[in-house]
C-alpha cells in the first residue's frame, strides 16, 4: 500500500522519500511561450488558471521540471553563492525535489529581476487571486508557513504543486496543504 506514494499525481518526493527511477514525464511549456517545462496535465491547468485571471505576463513561471543534473547544478550553485544553511533551507538535494516529477512550479509576480531560488509571489493582488482559485485547477501551495515541522521545508509561497482537482480541493478543505 505504501508503494503508492512513489507514483501518480500524489507522488511524495522529499528527503525521506527520494524520487524513484528517472522516468521523464510528458512535458509541455508551463505557460504559452515559456521555456519552463511542466507535466503536460499541470501545464494545461496552469494555463487555464492564468487565463481565467487574465494574468498572462503578470504571473510568470520561474522553475518547473528539473532533471537530476539540473537539480545538482542548482544545489552546487546555491552552496557556492549562499552557503550551506541557506541552501539546506531552500534547495532540495538532487533526487529529493518535487520539481523532478514535473508536477511542481515556482511562480513569480513579473518584475525586472526575479530571484530564482526565492521568487516574489505575494499574498495579495493577482497572486492572492491565483491562490484563491488554485485548488479549482488542481494546485496547492505546497510549503505553507507554519507547516515547516510537517514538511521539513521552509515556507515557499512561490511553490505550487499539481495534485489534480479533487485532491487539491480536499486538501484545501481539510488544511492538508
Residue ranges and their predicted role:
Residues 1-64, 68-177:
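Extracytoplasmic cell-surface/polysaccharide-interacting catalytic and binding patches
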